[in-house]
C-alpha cells in the first residue's frame, strides 16, 4: 500500500471513529423533545386555545376530550366519552383515526411504542 493510500486509510479510519454510535436507551429523545418534534407544530401546552391548528395539551390528566372552550372540535370527538388517561392517550397517539373515526386530527404516528409511552406520560403531567 502506497504512502498516500495509507494516509487516506488513516483519515477514513479517524472519520469512522468520529461517527456517533447508534442511539441507546440512555440517548433516547426526552419527552419534551418528542413533543417538539411531532406535536408542537399544531399544539401548544397550557390550557387556553391560542388559535393553533390543534387544541392545547396542558392539563390533559383525566380531562374529558373536547373540553377546551372555543376550540372547534370534530363532532366525533365532541360526542365521544373519552377521558385522557395514559392508556387512552397512547391509543390516540398510536392510531388517532383507528381510535375514533372522523376526527379532524390528521396525524401519522412516527414514534415507537416506547416513545409514545414516554410522550403520553409526560403530556399527562403537564399543566
What are these regions (language model features)?
Residues 26-49, 57:
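Sequence/structural segment immediately N-terminal to covalent heme-attachment motifs in c-type
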Residues 1-11:
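Bacterial N-terminal signal peptides that target proteins for export
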Residues 9-19:
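Bacterial N-terminal signal peptides
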Residues 67-90:
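Short Fe-S-cluster ligation motifs
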Residues 21-25:
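Sec/Tat signal peptide C-region and signal peptidase I cleavage site
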Residues 85-127:
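C-terminal capping alpha-helices of c-type cytochrome domains
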Residues 55-56, 103:
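Extracytoplasmic/periplasmic beta-strand context in beta-sandwich domains
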Residues 60, 64-67, 96-100:
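A short secondary-structure junction motif
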Amino acid at each position: 500500500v502506497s504512502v498516500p493510500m495509507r494516509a487516506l486509510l488513516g483519515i477514513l479510519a479517524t472519520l469512522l471513529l468520529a461517527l456517533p454510535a447508534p442511539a441507546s436507551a440512555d440517548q433516547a429523545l426526552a419527552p419534551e423533545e418528542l413533543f417538539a418534534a411531532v406535536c408542537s407544530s399544531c399544539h401548544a401546552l397550557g390550557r387556553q386555545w391560542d388559535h393553533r391548528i390543534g387544541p392545547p395539551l396542558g392539563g390533559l390528566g383525566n380531562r374529558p376530550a373536547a373540553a377546551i372552550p372555543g376550540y372547534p372540535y370534530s363532532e366525533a370527538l365532541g360526542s365521544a366519552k373519552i377521558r385522557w388517561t395514559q392508556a387512552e392517550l397512547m391509543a390516540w397517539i398510536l392510531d388517532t383515526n383507528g381510535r375514533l373515526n372522523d376526527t379532524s386530527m390528521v396525524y401519522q404516528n412516527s414514534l415507537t411504542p416506547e416513545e409514545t409511552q414516554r410522550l403520553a406520560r409526560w403530556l399527562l403531567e403537564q399543566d
